[in-house]
């Protein structure tokens, strides 16, 4: 699962494409608050929104994606992107 500020959409998608990510499910326009990037609630007080990408992949691909996200985080600093690795029991 990758959560990121919608303002960096093109950078995120470019990096993930170059990293070999082809398949995902995107949930646009979600609200949240991070410890370093602040609140994004889509209103006048806390503008901005986040997007979520769900990615189901094998372990080697996961490691590559995590590496790409870490490199992007170094470049963007506090713009707001996090990746979470969750165990996937089964895909039908």
Q: What spans do the regions from the language model cover?
A:
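Positively charged, small/polar-rich N-terminal and surface patches that mediate targeting and assembly
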Residues: 1-92
């Amino acid at each position: 699962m990758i959560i990121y500020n919608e303002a960096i959409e093109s950078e995120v998608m470019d990096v993930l494409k170059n990293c070999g990510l082809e398949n995902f499910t995107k949930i646009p326009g979600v609200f949240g608050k991070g410890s370093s990037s602040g609140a994004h609630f889509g209103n006048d007080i806390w503008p901005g929104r986040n997007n979520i990408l769900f990615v189901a992949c094998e372990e080697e691909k996961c490691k590559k994606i995590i590496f790409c996200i870490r490199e992007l985080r170094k470049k963007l600093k506090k713009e707001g992107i996090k990746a979470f690795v969750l165990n996937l029991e089964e895909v039908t």
